[in-house]
Design a protein with these regions (language model features):
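N-terminal leader/linker segments that precede catalytic domains of diphosphate-processing enzymes
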Residues: 1-45, 51-65, 73-103, 122, ...
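NUDIX/MutT-family hydrolases
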Residues: 106-137
Length: 140
């Protein structure tokens, strides 16, 4: 798939970030608990990987880079899901990545736990808050 969306150096319209939820070959969701020492969302469960799109970088490249940095994994496939303008003028590119059967993940230092949650968000554990369930249903 070719991606045409890029952040141009010097553009002042707001920042561009990318977020990628991660699914395995069985459709399960990778959830990671953020470390307690982090300034944003400490000790909260989150889906996937994400970060800022660097100037000149495509969102697909950002997603692949973040998957490697946060989970030490390369996706078998990435699919674009949504482009969302946030209230703070940030634009969020949302994608979904699927891992090859048998792929192993290794969380980075910003995660203190991880789990594979069932394919159906209605079957997720109590640690999954309502915003996570709603977000998952948007891309499921």
């Amino acid at each position: 798939m070719r991606w045409a969306l890029r952040l141009v150096a010097g553009d002042t319209s707001g920042s561009l970030s990318a977020l990628c939820v991660i699914r395995d070959s069985e459709g399960r969701w990778l959830a990671g608990r953020r470390a307690a020492w982090l300034a944003s969302w400490p000790s909260r469960w989150a889906l996937g990987a994400g970060g800022a799109v660097d100037p000149g970088e495509s969102p697909a490249t950002t997603l692949t880079r973040e998957l490697d940095e946060e989970w030490s994994v390369a996706p078998a496939r990435i699919q674009a899901e949504a482009l969302v303008r946030m209230p703070n003028d940030m634009v969020m590119f949302v994608g979904q990545a699927w891992l090859a059967p048998g792929a192993q993940v290794t969380p980075d230092h910003e995660h203190d736990d991880f789990a594979w949650w069932p394919a159906d968000p209605d079957d997720w554990p109590d640690e999954a808050d309502e915003p996570l369930r709603r977000a998952a249903k948007l891309v499921a």
